Amino acid sequence: MNTDLAGLGPDVVLEDTSIQRTVRRGDGEVHRWQKDGDYHVQVLHWAVSDRNDWERIKTRHLAADDPSRFPPDWEAEVERLRARDYPLQLIHWGVYGFARTLMGDEALAFAFYDDPGLVHDILDTYTTLALHIWERMTAVLDFDLIECWEDMAYRSGCLISPATFRHFLQPQYRRIRAFADAHRIPIVLVDSDGYIEPLTALMLESGVNALYPFEVQSGNDVASMLHTHPMLGALGGLDKRVMSQGRTAMDVELERAHTLIRIGRFIPGPDHFVLSDVTYANYAYFMRGLRQVVMETRPGS
């Protein structure tokens, strides 16, 4: 189900060389994609630079009743999902995150002050769209969690202040939590890279009750967070870099997973995507070891 922009049409390739490709998307974004390395995309022109851009996207690409949002075999998919033996989630492309993907971090940071009405409209319009689509989905299926993609922090700290979060983001998160409660969905999970601790208490106040991936190199301390916030669930939290540092480093991190699981409310995993300097042998060793840790360790043990 598409809870993002709809009806974009095909990308237009502006340049294609042996090392990079430059593409214009249907929403107007132009980005350069590097063909090697771990971090590939550089945005050259954002889709929204002013209110006119936003009105164009809002009118053309954010219709909740666009038939392309649901697959043609939706009814068959529903029957398949009703028989599942795994958790099922609803996707929200972020309160901050959705605006960020349209405007970029810098322009959005200015817009919070220079055009707050525009920011409120983007955030409110997108969450209204998501809730509308979710209503149709929850009418025929039960869901276990709602995941919100945010990425509102880097290694050195958060991209927004607590005051900005409270004023702009909190009202939308409370709408999401109200929807979750009304449909007996217990978990609202936020995905944000970087050092997210300064916003954690506000997220919990707003209805979020689980976070991931708790990047280690950004300074996140999962154990401290779990002890400080007894209603918080955590996922990730294991340093992905150890998979390129050898078995001794991996064993130390796996032992740390034991300790964190014992605290409770924690599902261990790499704290970001695995980088290209990791061999398959090292990856397999770490993941097999992690599986054993998970199967053998219980909260409170």
Predicted regions and their residues:
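A contiguous, low-structure linker/loop signature
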Residues: 9-64, 83-84
